[in-house]
Curated annotation (Swiss-Prot):
Site (Transition state stabilizer): H179, R240
Cofactor binding mode and count: Mg(2+). Can also accept Mn(2+).
Residues that bind ATP: K16, H207, I208, G209, N210, G211, D282, L283, R284, G330, V331, G332, E333, N334
Catalytic activity: acetate + ATP = acetyl phosphate + ADP
Family: Belongs to the acetokinase family.
Main enzyme class: transferase
Protein name as annotated: Acetate kinase
Residues reported to bind substrate: R90
Keyword Cytoplasm attached: yes
CDD domains listed in its UniProt record: ASKHA_NBD_AcK_PK
Domain of life where this protein originates: Bacteria
Gene Ontology CC entries for this record: cytoplasm
Record key words, sorted: ATP-binding, Cytoplasm, Kinase, Magnesium, Metal-binding, Nucleotide-binding, Transferase
Length: 398
């Protein structure tokens, strides 16, 4: 029997949704409500190749959910709210409390709230979405799906920082990792494509968008990942620095007179590709600029690829080899140039990739390795919403 599930991503002033039929994993409708609580609130709903837009004042998430449900009914996408069997909600941080998705109860809500200091920008907004749906659709299961859960299988030696141990015990300071729902989806999909049990595969998953993270997945479990206590750690990103020497923070403060908060802002919003190039955080712009001979754009691309290279090499060593390299997310799926830069020179570890196949894949699924390559290289468009919907069915006992 099929279930209709809403996959929800609630922001502080926005609400993204997809209505998905499970187990067929068919997208029935998707939409976005923007500027909740602000002037110029807007709703967009897409279904059957059509697009509906409307503008009206939307004061809070409860009203936003009400309007969304009304539109789904008015547009004939569902007959009434009883057609919806469950909801799944993206929650950014589950800390160590949630090693897997969870059916939302009052206690689970409190636990998510208790993790606010680990994700002050995201968890409160995610929780607003959960509470709105629980209020308006009380008779169905609501499931929280955490970005961090997939990485809770990392061993201690991977997640602990070399700090006094009591900082971990007292304050929860450790590597958590992010993009877990995406890494989980593409690794499972890779096993499906290859027709092999995931338990037999060593996978390096490269989620490369404006934010980027690399994950080492051994036997279907995350054993390491590049992001850390926050999404600032790891590889160079669009505007985030990735890994730096921590002593640079007080040094920059001393040299510039800026506060720790201001320096952190620079590391999050003015660094990465934008910081090095001085022009853009968008890889498409930088590829164009590099073609035109702009040296700093070229340098930004070289640094970007070099950092990803480093993680791929270290994760191959960690797993004593690799069977599959996956590229996913906006850049990983669409930029053959970035993929080429990252794959260049990896023949020593059994990666033989086909430039022709690589240049033909943009946003579609497929192999870019030569048939004889011991390591398979696959482009897989991520689908976090489907993963959220699957977990809504599983943990909601639908």
């Amino acid at each position: 029997m099929s279930n209709l599930v809403l996959a929800i991503n609630a922001g502080s002033s926005s609400l993204k949704f997809q209505l998905i039929e499970i187990p067929e994993e068919k997208l029935v409708s998707k939409g976005l409500i923007e500027r909740i609580g602000l002037k110029g609130s807007k709703i967009t709903v897409e279904y059957d190749g059509r697009k509906f837009t409307d503008e009206k004042e939307i004061n809070d998430h409860v009203q936003a959910v009400n309007i969304m449900l009304d539109n789904l009914i008015d547009l004939g996408i569902i007959r009434d709210i009883n057609d919806i069997d469950g909801t799944g909600h993206r929650v950014v941080h589950g800390g160590e409390l949630f090693p897997e998705s969870a059916l939302v109860t009052n206690n689970v809500e409190k636990q998510i709230e208790s993790l606010t200091e680990l994700a002050p920008l995201h968890n409160p907004a995610n929780l607003m979405g959960i509470r709105a749906f629980r209020k308006l659709l009380p008779g169905i299961p609501h499931v929280a799906v955490f970005d961090t859960s997939f990485h809770q299988t990392m061993p201690e030696q991977a997640y602990l920082y070399s700090l006094p141990f009591h900082y971990y015990k007292d304050y929860g300071i450790r590597k958590y990792g992010f993009h877990g729902t995406s890494h989980k989806y593409v690794s499972q999909r890779a096993a499906e494509i290859l027709g092999k049990p995931i338990e037999e595969l060593r996978i390096i998953s490269c989620h490369i968008g404006n934010g980027a993270s690399i994950a080492a997945i051994d036997g279907g479990e995350s054993v390491d990942t590049s992001m850390g206590f926050t999404p600032l750690a790891g590889v160079t990103m669009g505007t985030r620095s990735g890994d730096i020497d921590p002593a640079l923070i007080p040094y920059i403060m001393e040299k510039t007179g800026k506060s720790a908060e201001a320096v952190l802002d620079i590391l999050n919003k003015e660094s990465g590709l934008l910081g090095i190039s001085g022009t853009s955080s968008d890889l498409r712009d930088l590829e164009q600029d590099a073609e035109e001979g702009k040296t700093r754009a070229q340098l930004a691309l070289d640094v970007f690829a070099s950092r990803i290279h480093k993680y791929i090499g270290s994760y191959a060593a960690k797993m004593h080899g690799v069977d599959v390299v996956i590229f996913t997310a906006g850049v990983g799926e669409n930029s053959d140039e970035v993929r080429a830069r990252v794959l260049e020179g990896l023949e020593f570890m059994g990666v033989y990739w086909d430039p022709k196949k690589n240049s033909q894949l943009h946003g579609t699924e497929g192999f870019i390795n030569y048939p004889h390559s011991p390591v398979k290289v696959i482009v897989i468009p991520t689908n976090e919403e489907v993963m959220i919907a699957r977990d809504a069915v599983k943990f909601g006992s639908l």
